[in-house]
Amino acid sequence: MNIYLIRHTSVDVPAGYAYGQTDVLLRPSFEEEAEKVKESLSGLTFDKVWCSPLTRCVRLASYCGYPDAVREDRVKELNFGEWEMKSWEDLSSDPRSEAWFADWINIRTPNGESLKDQYDRVSSFLDETRKSGMQDVCIFAHGGVLTCARVYAGEYGIEEAFKNVPSYGEIIKLSFD
């Protein structure tokens, strides 16, 4: 089985902000970026296509020719809870951030998720997908989802996750027996 995972294009959010599951706008360069993704997918056919229900993924899937991609909550970005749309600089003064920065794999953000939570939901989806009998599938998702999928595939350990966040519009292919 081949699973193609595509990160959405760049977002119109200042650098250094936790935007996670917030439905943010895409940059004005969307069409230019999306065209590159679409070209990279030309010639490929998929048994099924999914996407995160967040607009930044739905829009890219639609642009690439998959307006009916199945919306899947398990491929949403990490939920930063109360920290959504706050700058990392501001969060450093939040007393709860010390514990999270010390163990972001296991500690949840306030009213949000830990990386382990996200990994578990992405893994659940990938397990189900692999059991489906399909050969080639595509998922339009987020940097954190692609990172969790690579951990799932054994490319690196979860502790290396934030060192390996894919670029906007990046496509990764994971192959399983």
PLM feature spans:
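Active-site signature of alpha/beta-hydrolase-fold catalytic machinery across serine-
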Residues: 63, 148-152
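Phosphate-handling substructures
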Residues: 64-121
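Glycine-rich phosphate-binding loop signature in dinucleotide/nucleotide-binding domains
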Residues: 42-45, 129-135
